[in-house]
Each structure stands twice: as C-alpha cells, then as structure tokens.
Amino acid sequence: MERPRFVDHPDPNAVLRGGPLNGGRTRVHNWVPVDFHVGDETCFYRPTGELDAQYPTLNVYVFDHAEPV
C-alpha cells in the first residue's frame, strides 16, 4: 500500500494516529475531518483538539473509518 504524497509533509502541523496511515505527518489548513485515498479505500481522520505526545507541536488526527472507493 502506497502512502499518499501529502502524508509525511515537510512542514507538518498534524499527526495521524490509528488506521493505515498511523504516524504520518501532514499539513491541514482547517481543523476539520480529512480524508486520504489509500489503495482501494478512502480513510477518514478527525481532529481531537489535542497535541501529540511524540510530536508535541503537532495536533492529533485519529482514524475514524474507511470506505471502499
């Protein structure tokens, strides 16, 4: 499974937790749920409003669900 190119962003402000993109760092422009196409699924992540323990300057987005494409 290939990670979307915008995961592991060079200037991230959010980290993805759970699901197939766990640990990926990305940049979001609005604090709203985001989706990523991964293989034959669309994975949805939602913001928690919390900072990450591993990356304390990044906001946490948690895996919500996946839907087939």
For each feature predicted by the language model, list its residue ranges:
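Domain-length accessory/inserted modules outside core catalytic folds
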Residues: 1-69
